[in-house]
């Protein structure tokens, strides 16, 4: 594995996260899979980040106990509820692994945690396997050329 290309992606992702405004979303995934990390700009509140849990992974790609432990070691919080659960619950929970980072957000650290999940948990071998989607709350597409990744085909 070429550590320099992952360091570059981590740096570039940190820059992209710093450009993510309130009501904007960025999803990085391994092409052809549902293995992802995603970010939601929350303005003055900070940023919500999520990493795919078994709720969203097909049977053959589900995370084992070692992967669960690795996500926790990286700094992710464990999922708090099932996707279909409704009703009141504590703000900040998620059916995915997640982090709610208050402002000011340490974008470099968040990028490091996210890339760590893509590589050491979800199995990305090369950044060229990754693609991204970015959009606003209204559904408008956003481009992040700083990432050096291909946008996902719509």
PLM region spans:
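Acidic, proline/glycine-rich low-complexity IDRs
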Residues: 1-6, 10, 89-154
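Extracellular, modular beta-sheet/disulfide-rich ectodomains of secreted and cell-surface proteins
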Residues: 2-3, 7-11, 15-40, 50-51, ...
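Hydrophobic, Leu/Ile/Phe/Ala-enriched alpha-helical segments that form helix-helix packing faces
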Residues: 12-24, 71, 75, 114-122
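Intrinsically disordered, low-complexity regulatory segments enriched in Ser/Thr/Pro
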Residues: 32-105, 123, 134-135, 154
């Amino acid at each position: 594995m070429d550590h320099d290309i992952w360091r570059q992606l981590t740096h570039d992702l940190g820059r992209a996260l710093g450009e993510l405004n309130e009501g904007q979303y960025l999803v990085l995934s391994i092409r052809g899979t549902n293995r992802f990390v995603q970010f939601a700009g929350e303005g003055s509140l900070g940023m919500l980040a999520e990493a795919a849990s078994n709720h969203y992974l097909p049977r053959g790609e589900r995370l084992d106990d070692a992967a669960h432990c690795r996500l926790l070691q990286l700094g992710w919080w464990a999922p708090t509820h099932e996707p279909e659960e409704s009703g009141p619950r504590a703000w900040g929970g998620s059916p995915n692994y997640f982090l709610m980072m208050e402002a000011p957000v340490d974008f470099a650290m968040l990028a490091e945690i996210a890339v760590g999940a893509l590589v050491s948990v979800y199995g990305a071998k090369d950044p060229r396997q990754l693609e991204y989607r970015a959009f606003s709350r209204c559904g408008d597409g956003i481009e992040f050329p700083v990432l050096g990744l291909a946008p996902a085909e719509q």
